[in-house]
Amino acid sequence: MAAERLWLDVPFAEKDMAKAAGARWDPAARRWYAPRPGMADLLRWAAGAEVPELLPGEDRSLGRGLFVDLVPSSCWFTNVRSCVAERDWERLRRMVHGRAGQRCEACGAGPDRAARRWLEAHERWSYDEARRVQTLRRLVCLCTDCHTVTHFGLAQVKGRAAEARAHLMRVTGMSEAGADRHIAAAFATWRERSRLTWTLDLAMLTDAGITVVPPPEAADRVAAAREALDAEEAGREAPGRAAPGGEALRRIPRQRRRTPG
């Protein structure tokens, strides 16, 4: 009887390091493993406990389909990836992709290296304006194209707005006018929510045993987002930061003057 695989939790940024230490990639499981016991150099990536497929309090009916879902500027860097350790993010990402059958939950597409299409985990939030609490309610698996639509402000910054708009129309069946109305309404909601300072509720993660770290203070989040985007454009990642799905990092005045898209 074959021995059970010694699985590893290897963050994407550390894959080359793990490979050099002897880790091997299982393409079927889409996961790294130790080819034999006793490989001390791989212990740092020893797999933790699996994350439950349904997180505590998660509502998998929330936010179905594809739509523009802009995170208020006062909430930048409250995304899950910025609030958990890279290894925990790998565990969460693997669970989200696995329960979705390695398919985008908005359009049904799978990963395609040739098309530069990957699967990504995205947060669905609820906003209690009376209490000013932003609560994580769901993690959803999206392909690169659908994720770009979701973070339409970042698509504008990166010069991909027309591409994102076309994908939104293709997946949802919206007309050009309908897509423009949808995008404009999303930015109107974004502007209203960005006027408030939100308290973050990540109980869905902490109740599952995931350790979270506090995001930057609300007053510092826009500057931190710009720093991360500048680093990304320069081909590097700011220490401890992943560029958020930031809305209007450099074009806030432009977005307030005209209809997006």
Name what the model sees in each region.
Residues M95-A100:
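Sequence/structural segment immediately N-terminal to covalent heme-attachment motifs in c-type
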Residues A85-E86, E90-R93, E105-C141, T150-G159:
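Histidine-centered nuclease catalytic patch
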Residues M17-W32:
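Short, flexible N-terminal segments of the mature chain
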Residues A28-R91, A109-A115, G159-G261:
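A boundary/linker detector
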Residues K15-M17, M39-R44, V133-Q134:
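Short, conserved charged micro-motifs
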Residues A3-V10, R30-A34:
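Short cationic amphipathic helices and targeting signals
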Residues L6-A21:
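Short amphipathic alpha-helix segments
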